[in-house]
């Protein structure tokens, strides 16, 4: 192989490494969203609602194992968490998960997404009961929102079709 080809491959390799590093340093984004019935709540960068389990206090992680099939932790990744307008950096933190990953907390609450929320404005995890506790949306002030979810299906973009006494079966 000629020196010209080797230089080309070296440049490509360095470029690929640079792109990989750019993707690796992305940080989660948290922002504020106004949702009917709930007020101003914390959402992720895609506008999806984030939740807190009632049994998880002071950064203590209880949702692990099969719980993670339903609730997806908001992980810190690399770099500083990006906060949108209306959120307080003083309330932002992290806690260590059992696997060593850092999970984002807001006002001490470890944050999760619910597997049934697929569009901004949905809050189908609100009031769900399971072995990890009862799940609540987190307000931008750092408090849990206890407003119950609708008890009948809305077919739209908000609420839950099973109400606030849903139990997630299987773990």
How would you name each of these model-derived features?
Residues 1-6, 14:
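Short, basic/polar N-terminal leader/transit segment immediately after the initiator methionine
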Residues 4-7, 20-171:
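Compact beta-sheet-dominated domain cores in extracellular/mature segments
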Residues 11-15, 22:
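Cleavable N-terminal signal peptides
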